Curated annotation (Swiss-Prot):
The gene is rpl-18A. Keywords: Ribonucleoprotein, Ribosomal protein. Pfam families: Ribosomal_L18A. This is Large ribosomal subunit protein eL20. GO terms for molecular function: structural constituent of ribosome. Belongs to the eukaryotic ribosomal protein eL20 family. GO terms for biological process: cytoplasmic translation. InterPro entries: Ribosomal_eL20, Ribosomal_eL20_dom, Ribosomal_eL20_eukaryotes.
Amino acid sequence: MPTKALGETLNEYVVVGRKIPTEKEPVTPIWKMQIFATNHVIAKSRFWYFVSMLRRVKKANGEILSIKQVFEKNPGTVKNYGVWLKYDSRTGHHNMYREYRDTTVAGAVTQCYRDMGARHRAQADRIHILKVQTVKAEDTKRAGIKMFHDAKIRFPLPHRVTKRKNLSVFTTARQNTHFA
């Protein structure tokens, strides 16, 4: 299932659906879910996947009332996000909490999918995002996120290779790339 972002960030959708009313059950409960997907078609598909697992209702016996893409209110500021997830690996089910810094919730979740694929070889359709929440700077737990909260943060000079134009491709001396 193409849950992963193919080059771009995932979008955040709020999908609202319910079981189709019947004579036996004229008033049915409404379910609302926050889904991260590349487009609205995949968001609907993931909605029915989760509803069939949680409420035992198939797509044939249900209907989607609304689907809306959610946009970040102020995407210009960097925030800390905590992501609670569960995923299935070759050995079993795992629960996990991860932290990311990003400007949007969808960007943080995209980072999470890519990070889980890289570190744990978890496939995108086996990852279930349970909750995403902004985390205050003093409440962050991970050292990789805490190091960016220093006001006097300094970044090292990068290890650059300068491209000189009028030089031959092959040379007898190795170039110096350390500029410290």
